[in-house]
Amino acid sequence: MFHEPMLLGFPDYQLQAKNLARLLKIEYADAELHHFPDGESKIRLPVDIPSTVVICRSLDSPNNKLIELFFTVKELRQKGCEHIILAAPYLCYMRQDKEFQPGEAVSQRWVGRLLASLFDEVITVDPHLHRVKKLDDIIKTKRVVSLSAASLIGNQIALRVADPLIIGPDEESKQWVEQIAQLHQFNYLVGDKTRMGDREVNVVLPPSDVKDRSVVLVDDMASTGNTLINTARQLKNLGVNNIYCAITHALFVGESYQELLATGVKEVWSTDSVSHPSNCISLASLLAEAIKL
């Protein structure tokens, strides 16, 4: 056991974890992963473990990752680690925040309790909170930090587009749209979305003269991409030629990214909370400022 903190990274998020360790000026080490043919995971950790460990791993495609984090933390505790910080830029299972149909598990609640039982601190970026407004009402541990990428996204927009109109596709996106617009004095508007299933949405935009504007669609995440795709198509039909998208979490399942680009969207900018070709905004400095060692 030694006392200098260590940052532990995983193969699927290695670049971002190494960048964070560099900014924190602490040692980086890999958690080695092996997946057996039957789907089970084996984890190998460094032999020498300090009293404080930062784990940097984003929780997209979460099911394997959650059990692997469970094994990792339990083994770290077994080796005498006293303080474990999770830096998870994308936090999974935040959307199921109520029992929508009788008998449904409220996964947000149970994942929150799992993380609270494992970690002394949890730090994330733009968690998808709707009915539950505060992250520390979900994850009740010693320290919980919910960061916003709004200023970083706003800076990217200002760098790439002159006099943009910022559009949020629905009420849930309003908090990010307002932050970005206020920081840079951008004009903005927010649409109204009706969800008809996992992959079906309808977005209605308020009346506005958008034809000659450069429009930036802003949302916290893109999963199926249907919200952004639907909105981009409407804007194209209204005669908008310059459409961009800026998002925090680029999940983009299946062919959704290609489908979004096929609507005529010129560029997609995302943070590196989830590894994706659209990543152009690093969260390392934002996370580093929030981690207290």
Labelled PLM ranges:
Residues M1-L293:
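PRPP-associated nucleotide enzymes
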